Amino acid sequence: MNIIVVGLSHKTATVEIREKVAFAPTQMEKPLHALVSLPDITEAVIVSTCNRVEIYATTRDIAGGVARLKRFLADYHNISLETLEPHLYSYHGEAATRHVFRVASSLDSMVVGEPQILGQIKTSYGYAAEYKSSGIILNRFLHKAFSVAKRVRTETKIASSAVSVAFAAVELAKKIFGDLSDKTVMLIGAGEMCELAAKHFINTGVRGVMVTNRTFERAVKLAEEFDGKAVNYEELFDHLHKADIVLSSTGAPHFIIGPKNVEEVIRRRKMKPMFFIDIAVPRDIDPKVNDVENIYLYTVDDLNGVVATNLEQRNKEAEKAEAIVEQEIGQFFKWLSSLEVTPTIVALRSKFDEIRRAELAKTLANWKELPPDAEKRLEALTSAIMNKLLHQPTSVLKRAEQGNRNDLYIDALRNLFELETTRPEVEELGELEE
């Protein structure tokens, strides 16, 4: 069985492309069930964040599985595959494992070391577990990814020198306005990114924070944490003119702020400049807003410029993290290979031993008088012959296991000898590692 990855990220696709293939976190049941209904796709997990959309799956047919996942992404979102394919990447085997371990460890993030991606993958895995689209392989695979990320976080200082996307947004605001002590911030959304942004804005000494959210109680809760003010979502445009900086991160499927809204707001501000940061995918703010005078709109892609200057220390820590990833890849593949190889070897030996015992029993039944130790000697002789015969195929299978080339041999043996194998039980892992 092979692990495959198909997806796109901020490295291969603009926000305009990414938002077209984003999956709503509250509507994962349908696409997950559709994925595991595809031919040869046995398990699947969808990871959909601001900066990436990826599908992790298991299949016996690598080329066919990758093609089906690409077609699924295009068809599910009503996009032509010709439009989407240039932005897609795919991995299988060791490369897929390396990619997911690196993603979970934030080594592939826009901001290396940011902690949000691990939580996002855990949430994605939670949906797959809830809707039963993940199984023995992806369960173990993602728990391994979580433990790799934990090792990276505890054994390196990669997180200590990292800046999150939310922090990058604050840094961008400082570049636009300079001193933020007389500025008021409006947060649209009350999720993790807005909470992080609120912390960073408060630390820079902004004058005040307003929070609005479709669920007013969540807005109140976040606002209270920072001595801010909660605003009813329906009254957003009654209060927007009071904000100098607006950061939006909701899960809305369409624009919630357009140019006409902003034209009215800027008039009420007597043309005082406003800074909008849209870190939602799909985007919350119509890009035409940027055409309004004295309005400055930035998206998640614009944050690349803020975070492009990686510190030397972070790069050194990233090298340590990469070494951890490489070490863990080998350990995971040893387990994955044994999942197929060990039961096959056991089944092969069992089949041969069954035949040996049956034939030996027939032979002994036809001999009326035997020396006292004859049965014991014949037992040893036939066992030795069987072991000699099985030594070479067993050795080849074990060598193939180490080289990750075992599927061909396993399938051949199962077909030639009509083997029935049962995978070994894998211990159920409890709570997700923090």
Curated annotation (Swiss-Prot):
At the top level of its lineage, which domain of life is listed?
Bacteria
> Which Gene3D superfamilies does UniProt cross-reference here?
Glutamyl-tRNA reductase, N-terminal domain, NAD(P)-binding Rossmann-like Domain
Q: What is its EC number?
A: 1.2.1.70
- The feature of type site (Important for activity) is located at 99
Q: Which GO terms describe its biological process?
A: protoporphyrinogen IX biosynthetic process from glutamate
Under the heading SUPFAM superfamilies, the entry gives: Glutamyl tRNA-reductase catalytic, N-terminal domain (SSF69742), Glutamyl tRNA-reductase dimerization domain (SSF69075), NAD(P)-binding Rossmann-fold domains (SSF51735)
Catalytic activity entry: (S)-4-amino-5-oxopentanoate + tRNA(Glu) + NADP(+) = L-glutamyl-tRNA(Glu) + NADPH + H(+)
Binding-site positions, NADP(+): 189-194
What does the entry's free-text domain comment contain? Answer: Possesses an unusual extended V-shaped dimeric structure with each monomer consisting of three distinct domains arranged along a curved 'spinal' alpha-helix. The N-terminal catalytic domain specifically recognizes the glutamate moiety of the substrate. The second domain is the NADPH-binding domain, and the third C-terminal domain is responsible for dimerization.
Purpose? Catalyzes the NADPH-dependent reduction of glutamyl-tRNA(Glu) to glutamate 1-semialdehyde (GSA).
Tell me the subunit arrangement: Homodimer.
Q: What's the miscellaneous note?
A: During catalysis, the active site Cys acts as a nucleophile attacking the alpha-carbonyl group of tRNA-bound glutamate with the formation of a thioester intermediate between enzyme and glutamate, and the concomitant release of tRNA(Glu). The thioester intermediate is finally reduced by direct hydride transfer from NADPH, to form the product GSA.
Q: What name appears for this protein in its UniProt entry?
A: Glutamyl-tRNA reductase
Which species does the entry assign this protein to? Geotalea uraniireducens (strain Rf4) (Geobacter uraniireducens)
Gene name of the encoded protein: hemA
